[in-house]
Each structure stands twice: as structure tokens, then as C-alpha cells.
């Protein structure tokens, strides 16, 4: 299952690899585009992340996937980790590729003079911002310009997963991001990934994380069981 799938491009990519995929997003307009893009190859469900276990009928999956720019819209990372656990079969895997919380803490309005402006750690109150354009190539204006977002520190994310009964199997920080996040300070490689032109080792801009659901909330180890649906 692909959480916060938006218009479903990553969801469709998983389907093309042979997976039976369910995409979940709370935006009906996004899912309209996703269904037009994927046709019958993917099942799309309209719901917010925290409602996913109930909306999906307590169905369990082999894999939960979350992509870049998703976790920042969630106010409670510990609650999210529990949702992910509830969606997985014992032995099921979580895979995340996300923007690094260091990147989200930067003020990106002037890439020539970067400064830490926003919280690195999760806060009770959201960061409220106003956006004039979307990352989608379009000449249409944004109708709902006010956004509410929350950052989550890397340690907070890992600890939330461990406390929910996951075993962390891989965590990598990366120097590249799939868009020009820092204006004139980044250059694209042959894959279309952007890194700092000078000394890219200075700044992590994305990370990937893999974890396996192995432990129940009480601390006992669960035996692997069959999946009711795979993705």
C-alpha cells in the first residue's frame, strides 16, 4: 500500500514492477488524476492516513511505501508509525524515501543565503505558510494557498518505529534530491537527481529507511503470517 499517494506516479511504478498495489490519499482531485493515469492497474482509496486501517477494512499488506513530501503533512509521527504497523502483516516491510528534516528546516526562499528557519523536531503547532505555485507544471493558480506542515526529526521517526514494534534494517542519508531544492546551488546528474555543486558532502537532503514489523506492542516477537493482500 502506498500512503499519501497523491496523483499516483510512484504507485503506478510499483504496479509496473508486478505488485498488486493500493494507493491511499485524502484528496479526491488527486485521486481523480491518479485513476486517469493508472487505469485498472491500481486500486485507489480516498482517506487520510490515520484512518487507513479502518477504511481498508483491517486488510494487511506485505509492504507500506511512502515517498518524498508526505510525512510533513502529518502532525503526529508516533501515531503514523502505529498506523503503518497495523497495515502490515508480521514480517511486512516499510520503505520510505523522504526529504531530510535538515532540508525542511531551512528557509529556501533565498538559496544563496541559507539559514535554519523552521523546526527540525516535531512541534505541537504547525508551520503555517502560503504558497503561490505548485510543483506540478501548470498555468493554473493555487486555490487553497495556506499550508500547515510539521517537521519530524530523524531520531523521532526511528524511535516511533522502534516503539511501534519495528526492526530497523537500513537507514541511509543522501546528497541528492529529485528537484532543484536549492536554486542555483544545485546541479542535476544523469538520473535527474540534484546535488550541491560545491562540496555536496556538507548537506543531507534526502534519506531512505527500511524497517520490518517484527515485534508486538508488548515486546513479544510475532510469528510471520500470510498476507491478505500484497503490494
Q: For the regions a protein language model found, what residue spans apply to each?
A:
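A short acidic, Gly/Pro-enriched loop at the edge of an enzyme's catalytic core
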Residues: 54-64
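A short SAM/SAH-binding and catalytic strip from SAM-dependent methyltransferases
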Residues: 62-78
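Acceptor-substrate binding/catalytic loop of class I
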Residues: 98-112, 140-156
